[in-house]
A protein has these predicted regions:
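Internal alpha-helical transmembrane segments
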Residues: 58, 62-163, 347
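Extended, hydrophilic extramembrane loops/domains of integral membrane proteins
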Residues: 239-268
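Membrane-anchoring signal-anchor transmembrane alpha-helices and their immediate flanking context
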Residues: 1-87
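Hydrophobic alpha-helical transmembrane segments in multi-pass membrane proteins
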Residues: 18-30, 63-75, 110-119, 284-292, ...
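Non-transmembrane, extracytosolic/lumenal segments of membrane-associated proteins
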Residues: 50-51, 111-222
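Interfacial "coupling" helices/loops that link adjacent transmembrane helices in transporter permeases
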Residues: 4-15, 86-104, 300, 304-310
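Transmembrane alpha-helical segments that form the functional core of multipass membrane systems
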Residues: 270-361
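Short, aromatic-rich amphipathic segments at membrane interfaces
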Residues: 53, 57-59, 261-281
Length: 365
C-alpha cells in the first residue's frame, strides 16, 4: 500500500511538472502573439501607446490561459508519460503488475482538480480582466460609440452621432424578435453632455435604420410639452447588433452566468451564447480528464511500437480535431439545430469515449 501511494504521488508530481512547463510556454507564446496583433491593430491610433497595448495584452492573458488549458493538459500528459516510458519507469511498473488505469488515475485526478480550480476560482478573475480588456478594445481600437446594458430595471442603451450628441434610451420591456421597446424614455444630451430634451413614449421600434417612436410626449427645456404620434431618429443599430452588444459570455463569471441567463430570457432575448458558455465551463474538468486519456493512448504506444513520431502526429491531430469538432457543434448549438447542452458536452463525451476505448484496446486487446 505504501509503495502504491509513493508511486501515485510520483506520477502526480511528474504530470504536474510537465503540465506546468507546457502551460507556461503556451501562455507566453500566445501573450506575445496577442501583443504583436494589438500593435498591428493600434498602429494608426494615437491613443494606442505601446504601454497601453502591453496592458491590454496582459488583461487578455487570463482569458487566453483558459483557452489553452485543454491543449496544455494534452501535450503535458504526452511529455510526462513519454519521459516515464523512455526511462523504462512505466515498463518496470507494468512488469510489477501495475495496470494502465492505476498509473493514469493520479494524472486524471490532478487534471480534474485543475479543472475545478480553473472554473470556480480562476474563471471569475479571467472574466473581470476580459471585461476591462473589451472596454479598452472598444474605446481604443474600435472606437465604438454604442453601449448597452441589461438589468432588472430594463434595457439601457446609449448611442451617439459624429457630432458627439448622445441619446440614452431606457425601455421597461422588450420584444426581441422585432425589437419593439415598450415604456420608452429617451434622454438627449449635446456634445458637452448637457441635457437638452426628453421623450416619453409607448413604443419604439427599429425600422430601416431608424428608431420609430410612437405615441409620446417630447419635453424640451423652457418649452411646453409637445405630444406626437410618430418621430423617427436615425441610428446605425440593428437587432443583431443589439443582441451581440450584451455582455460577452467571456466577461461573465461562472457564478454570475445562471442569473444573467435568467435575466436575458425574462427580457425576451435569446441566451444561447451564455447558456453554451456555462455548459462548456461545467464540462471543463471532465474535458481535462479526457485529454489525459487521449494523450496516454499515444504516449504509451511508444513502448510497443518504438517511435516518437506517432506520439507527436497523434497529439497534434487530436488537438486539431478537438478544436474543429468543438467549433462545429458549438455553431450547431448556437443556431438551435441541436440542444445547447448537447453541443457543449459533445467534445468532452467524444474525447472520453475515444480515450477510454483506445486504452482498453491497448491494455486488454
Amino acid at each position: 500500500m505504501h509503495v502504491a501511494k509513493t508511486f501515485s504521488a510520483y506520477i502526480a508530481r511528474q504530470f504536474s511538472a510537465w503540465f506546468g512547463g507546457v502551460f507556461a510556454a503556451m501562455v507566453i507564446i500566445t501573450f506575445l502573439l496577442d501583443y504583436i496583433e494589438l500593435i498591428r491593430r493600434g498602429g494608426a491610433k494615437i491613443q494606442a501607446t505601446l504601454g497601453l497595448l502591453l496592458e491590454m495584452a496582459a488583461l487578455k492573458l487570463p482569458h487566453t490561459a483558459q483557452e489553452v488549458l485543454p491543449f496544455a493538459i494534452l501535450f503535458g500528459t504526452m511529455l510526462a508519460f513519454w519521459r516515464l516510458t523512455r526511462n523504462n519507469e512505466l515498463v518496470v511498473a507494468r512488469a510489477a503488475g501495475v495496470s494502465v488505469w492505476q498509473f493514469l488515475t493520479p494524472a486524471v485526478l490532478v487534471a480534474f482538480l485543475i479543472g475545478l480550480v480553473a472554473v470556480t476560482i480562476f474563471n471569475p478573475i479571467a472574466s473581470l480582466t476580459e471585461a476591462v480588456y473589451e472596454k479598452l478594445e472598444s474605446h481604443i481600437l474600435r472606437q465604438g460609440s454604442d453601449q448597452l446594458a441589461l438589468s432588472d430595471s430594463g434595457l439601457w442603451l446609449r448611442q451617439s452621432d459624429q457630432a458627439g450628441n448622445q441619446i440614452v434610451i431606457h425601455a421597461g420591456k422588450i420584444a426581441s424578435q422585432q425589437l419593439v421597446l415598450d415604456a420608452v424614455t429617451l434622454f438627449f444630451f449635446n456634445a458637452s453632455t448637457q441635457f437638452t430634451s426628453r421623450i416619453d413614449a409607448q413604443t419604439a421600434r427599429l425600422e430601416s435604420g431608424d428608431w420609430v417612436i410612437e405615441n409620446g410626449i417630447r419635453w424640451v427645456a423652457d418649452e411646453a410639452p409637445r405630444p406626437f404620434d410618430e418621430i423617427r431618429l436615425a441610428t446605425t443599430l440593428t437587432p443583431r447588433k443589439i443582441e451581440e452588444s450584451f455582455a460577452s459570455p467571456d466577461t461573465m463569471s461562472f457564478w454570475d452566468l445562471p442569473g444573467f441567463i435568467e435575466l436575458l430570457e425574462q427580457s425576451g432575448f435569446p441566451a444561447q451564447r451564455h447558456r453554451l458558455h456555462f455548459n462548456v465551463l461545467l464540462a471543463r474538468p471532465f474535458l481535462l480528464c479526457a485529454m489525459v486519456l487521449v494523450a496516454a493512448t499515444f504516449s504509451l504506444r511508444m513502448q510497443r511500437r518504438g517511435g516518437a513520431t506517432l506520439m507527436i502526429v497523434g497529439g497534434v491531430a487530436s488537438g486539431f480535431l478537438l478544436y474543429f469538432v468543438s467549433d462545429i457543434v458549438f455553431a450547431l448549438g448556437l443556431s438551435t439545430k441541436i440542444p445547447v447542452a448537447l453541443a457543449a458536452w459533445t467534445p468532452t463525451g467524444v474525447s472520453l469515449i475515444f480515450g477510454t476505448s483506445m486504452l482498453l484496446h491497448l491494455e486488454d486487446g
